[in-house]
């Protein structure tokens, strides 16, 4: 598996879960690392991690903070060329799962006429010119299959990237849920704000970036808190917009009501202990945290952002949907959800059968079939 990345994201965790499941079944899995991918996952299985460049070299590149992260990744990929070529020659019978923006490995798989089976997993909502180049180059590979995580991406990929060969395109959900998540969600939360039974806790989880649109969530919560003073908003995650969000919280006089807890090792217990989960993103794939929240039993609201969340909650069957980037619509939905807790719990219960498709065992089996057949 190779998925060059600056920092560990949900997509990397998806690939790692697939790798771990296949490894547990006796398959030999190797993770080829260029950047920070799989940095935050615990490797307690037989999966071999291979750093194509020394970790110290990549950390050195990250020191130059004036460099755009994309430039850092380009430099890292250049340094990884010779080690990757050596790996190709030593592992001619290997198959490859490529993720995120794998233009670097694809070029050398083509140049050296590698006939291995290759699966290119397309995640999120690809919009960049670089991704267009990835698609164009991937078509030169002789034995490639494409995977997308939900049906909604089919039309998008076809229309935006001249993708006519839908026969090579498979829909396989991401590996999001497993027994460990359910078990960890049952752990006790120590923070005092979760101990007050008179408080109603709303939660948002994710990187503090423009994509996640936490500023809209805070503005909507500001309106809600006027109606329901007992409400508390908890936000888990770090990111470049943290200072901006803190200033917004201060300007709205919400410093006692909005709690930024940063990155936590076990977000699941916080979601399980909350009354309502909100995903306010401007764009998403299927929405991993949305799936996690539903999977552990927390009622959910999501924006109708492109391209996957609406499909994840089945057009509102499993939660509430609000207009993308609309403060007022989100405020109304939060009010509605808290006023109808029994209905919201019913929606969660109705999602249980559908959520099974996101369990790692099922997802890994589907990927394995692509390589076997």
Model-derived features: positions:
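Short His-centered aromatic/hydrophobic patch
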Residues: 77-80, 97-104, 122
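Conserved donor-binding/catalytic core segment of Leloir-type glycosyltransferases
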Residues: 195-212, 218-221, 281
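Short hydrophobic beta-strand element within catalytic cores of glycosyltransferases
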Residues: 299-303
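Conserved acidic donor-binding segment of nucleotide-sugar-dependent glycosyltransferases
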Residues: 315-327, 336-341
């Amino acid at each position: 598996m190779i998925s060059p990345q600056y920092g560990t994201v949900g997509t990397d965790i998806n690939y790692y879960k697939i790798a771990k499941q296949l490894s547990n079944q006796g398959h030999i899995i190797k993770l080829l690392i260029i950047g920070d991918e799989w940095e935050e996952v615990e490797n307690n299985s037989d999966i071999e991690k291979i750093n194509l460049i020394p970790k110290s070299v990549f950390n050195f590149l990250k020191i130059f903070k004036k460099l755009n992260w994309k430039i850092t990744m380009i430099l890292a990929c250049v340094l990884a060329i010779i080690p990757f070529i050596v790996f190709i020659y030593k592992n001619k019978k290997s198959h490859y799962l490529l993720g995120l923006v794998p233009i670097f490995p694809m070029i050398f798989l083509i140049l050296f006429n590698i006939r291995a089976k290759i699966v290119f997993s397309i995640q999120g909502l690809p919009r960049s010119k670089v991704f267009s180049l990835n698609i164009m180059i991937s078509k030169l590979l002789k034995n490639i299959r494409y995977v997308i995580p939900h049906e909604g991406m089919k039309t998008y990929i076809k229309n935006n990237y001249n993708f006519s060969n839908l026969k090579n395109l498979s829909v396989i959900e991401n590996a999001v849920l497993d027994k460990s998540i359910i078990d960890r969600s049952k752990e006790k939360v120590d923070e005092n704000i979760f101990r007050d039974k008179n408080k109603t806790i709303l939660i948002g989880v994710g990187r503090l970036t423009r994509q996640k649109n936490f500023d809209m969530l805070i503005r909507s919560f500001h309106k809600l808190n006027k109606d329901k003073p007992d409400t508390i908003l908890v936000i888990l995650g770090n990111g470049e917009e943290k200072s901006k969000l803190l200033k917004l919280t201060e300007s709205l006089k919400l410093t006692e009501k909005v709690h930024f807890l940063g990155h936590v090792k076990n977000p699941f217990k916080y979601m399980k202990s909350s009354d309502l989960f909100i995903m306010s993103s401007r764009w998403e794939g299927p929405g991993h945290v949305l799936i996690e929240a539903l999977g552990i039993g927390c009622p959910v609201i999501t924006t109708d952002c492109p391209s996957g969340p609406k499909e994840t909650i089945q057009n509102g069957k499993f939660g509430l949907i609000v207009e993308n980037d609309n403060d007022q619509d989100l405020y109304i939905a939060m009010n509605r959800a808290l006023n109808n807790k029994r209905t919201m719990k019913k929606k969660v219960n109705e999602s249980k059968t559908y959520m099974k498709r996101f369990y790692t065992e099922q997802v890994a089996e589907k990927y394995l079939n692509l390589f076997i057949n």
